[in-house]
C-alpha cells in the first residue's frame, strides 16, 4: 500500500551557515559593527544588541540569511526581548518536528477532505497511506495549500 510521511525538519548545517552569514553581515554594517552579536546553541539563537531597533535590524538580517540558504522562516519562534544590563537580548527558538496539536490538525484536514487516504500520528511525524498514488499526491497538494504555521516536508514516499 503506497504511503508517505509528513515531517518538519531543519537542515542544521544550512542553519549554521545562515547564522555565520548573518554574523558576517553584522560585521559589515557600519551602524551595527561591534554593537550586536548572534549566539547559536542547539536549537536556540540568542541575539544581543544595545537597543531594540538594533535587535529588529538583526532579526531582519537573520531572516534574509535564512532565506538565502533556503531555510523556511516559519520554523522561527520569537521570545520576548529583555534587558540585561546595558544590552537587550532576545531568544529565537528553531522549531523542528510536528507537535501533537499540528499533527491532529493535519489528520483532521485529511479526514475532512474526503480523500481515500488514512492519516496516522507517529511521534513527530504523520504517516499517510492510501490505495492509489494519485490520492497521495492529492493529499500532498492539499497540505501544501494550507497555512499551518510550520514548514512541512514529505519524505519516505513508497509505492
Curated annotation (Swiss-Prot):
Q: What are its GO cellular component terms?
A: cytosol
Protein name, as recorded: Nucleotide-binding protein Avin_13410
Q: Keywords for this entry?
A: Nucleotide-binding
Q: Which InterPro entries match?
A: DUF520, UPF0234-like_C, UPF0234_N, YajQ-like_sf
Check the record and name the Pfam families matching this protein: DUF520
List the disulfide bonds in this chain: none
Lineage of source species:
Bacteria, Pseudomonadati, Pseudomonadota, Gammaproteobacteria, Pseudomonadales
**GO terms for molecular function, please?**
nucleotide binding
Q: Give the species.
A: Azotobacter vinelandii (strain DJ / ATCC BAA-1303)
Q: What does this protein do?
A: Nucleotide-binding protein.
Supply the HAMAP family for this chain: YajQ
Which family would the database say this protein is a member of? Belongs to the YajQ family.
Amino acid at each position: 500500500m503506497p504511503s508517505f510521511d509528513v515531517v518538519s525538519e531543519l537542515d542544521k548545517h544550512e542553519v549554521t551557515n545562515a547564522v555565520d552569514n548573518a554574523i558576517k553581515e553584522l560585521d559589515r554594517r557600519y551602524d551595527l559593527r561591534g554593537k550586536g552579536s548572534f549566539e547559536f546553541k542547539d536549537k536556540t539563537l540568542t541575539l544581543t544588541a544595545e537597543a531594540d531597533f538594533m535587535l529588529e535590524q538583526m532579526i531582519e538580517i537573520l531572516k534574509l540569511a535564512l532565506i538565502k540558504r533556503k531555510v523556511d522562516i516559519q520554523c522561527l519562534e520569537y521570545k520576548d526581548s529583555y534587558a540585561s544590563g546595558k544590552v537587550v537580548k532576545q531568544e529565537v527558538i528553531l522549531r523542528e518536528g510536528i507537535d501533537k496539536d499540528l499533527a491532529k490538525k493535519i489528520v483532521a484536514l485529511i479526514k475532512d477532505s474526503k480523500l481515500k487516504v488514512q492519516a496516522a500520528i507517529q511521534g513527530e511525524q504523520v504517516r499517510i497511506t492510501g490505495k492509489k498514488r494519485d490520492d497521495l499526491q492529492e493529499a500532498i497538494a492539499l497540505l501544501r495549500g494550507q497555512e499551518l504555521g510550520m514548514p512541512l516536508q514529505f519524505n519516505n514516499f513508497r509505492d
